[in-house]
Swiss-Prot record:
Function of the protein: Involved in the organization of the Ori region of the chromosome into a macrodomain (MD). It constrains DNA mobility in the Ori macrodomain and limits long-distance DNA interactions with other chromosomal regions.
Pfam families in the cross-refs: DUF413
InterPro entries with a match to the protein in the record: DUF413
The protein's name: Macrodomain Ori protein
Domain of life (superkingdom): Bacteria
Record region (Disordered): 91-112
Taxonomic placement: Bacteria, Pseudomonadati, Pseudomonadota, Gammaproteobacteria, Enterobacterales
Residue spans of biased composition, Acidic residues class: 103-112
Cysteines engaged in disulfide bonds, as pairs: none
Amino acid sequence: MAESFTTTNRYFDNKHYPRGFSRHGDFTIKEAQLLERHGHAFNDLDLGKREPVTEEEKLFVAVCRGEREPVTDAERVWSKYMTRIKRPKRFHTLSGGKPQVEGAEDYTEADD
């Protein structure tokens, strides 16, 4: 991976991970460092803005297109990142579900 995925800028995703990859808890320290170091190259290869140069980059693009399963650390961490940012956000409410209406109990009248 020495000549593969070269980039000069560190990668940060302020929209999905405003406190950074390592502080969010989705990624291990190693995965967060890999994303920060090579994230721009991963993103450019995934979007087609950059042509793959090495064999490793060509295999990475195949993983991004869904043609093969992720094998290397770079492929696994990018797949994990993409799944995390594409999943719908879960939110929790404080209400108990359906709204309660007063006086809507079930009454049955019995003839005595």
